[in-house]
């Protein structure tokens, strides 16, 4: 596709668009100009039914070969007065309250039987050859891109206000979706309370995804190096020389340094004897170079934070999933992990403190996204988004009283994110696997026990349809 950098026709068409106009007029007067500027021809567009009762407004293909799945599915809406009057700083939060936006997403709306992006990217509802990787909701006032990674559907950008000044940026974002290589999902597992099973979860979720044919990288950013020792891995000190290359804008050499530091481990499951490989960007086993980098005065805190975040961006093209482990302390390594993650999965146990810390992170994520979006000048993808709570170290018998305390505490904390049904119990096989320095699927003699729980969690969170917009 040839990109036309002159967005004047789009800006002019938008400026001439009435503040109240029907959906069809938004499509013919404005969106047709957008597709033209992106070099998209009529042979790259389609419409029609993609599943039972599912008929999006547009399917956009990378080229004229429609035997491959579309790259983008679009749901557009009419323009109504009121959106342009919303303050820029509050546009995302206030736009979410409008039924028109909710309908575009596919949220339930009173007296409406609507489908939207969450249905059009649902792998359980859409024919595989019509299932897109990206989604767009648009009405001439709001613009938001969405992303699908296996079964997980999540925002790729905040809700952006369409203005003459923002049109060049949103066009570049569309161009990214149409042309950029697909990047893997960067997942941070974190809670400010320690002992909630984040490292154990990373190792075993990574293993289950690798068993499903996914290319998985685990990154140890915790100076305790539990992940490194937990898989008997070791990497050379890469951070200082890598950061120096970044400061020179030598991204190619910076990535090569990371690639050389990555080690791999091969495993075999205990029951099916299935082989799989996990890649690890490890520490040195003692956490020395992570501590040195954290405490170094050779780089500013912002440089160190951005270097960690950029690491994920550089490596994401080579993996399906990247899982990052960081200290419970909010040091610069942890902040870099949060800043560079697409999503955060928050392990909690049946403890009031872990719920408190998870809820605090949940409420702070919009600020992190806004900072990342602003500092990255709209670079995609933008995160982190809240993937939800996973209960770890669960007692086998907890009773209704404890369940009620947990539920009431989350209500008090105003936690509105997801809570996964799969709960990870304390089982001996997990401890045996830790001593053997392998994932539990390599030492689980009971398929209904530990490994099965991680298998179910990997499916619930990543492989089966799972929608989040927190």
Which role fits each region the language model picked out?
Residues 145-146, 151-470:
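P-loop NTP-binding core
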Residues 137-139:
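Charged, structured surface patches that assemble and position nucleic-acid processing machinery
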Residues 1-134, 148-185:
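A short, conserved, highly charged catalytic patch centered on acidic carboxylates
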Residues 141-143:
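Loop/turn residues immediately N-terminal
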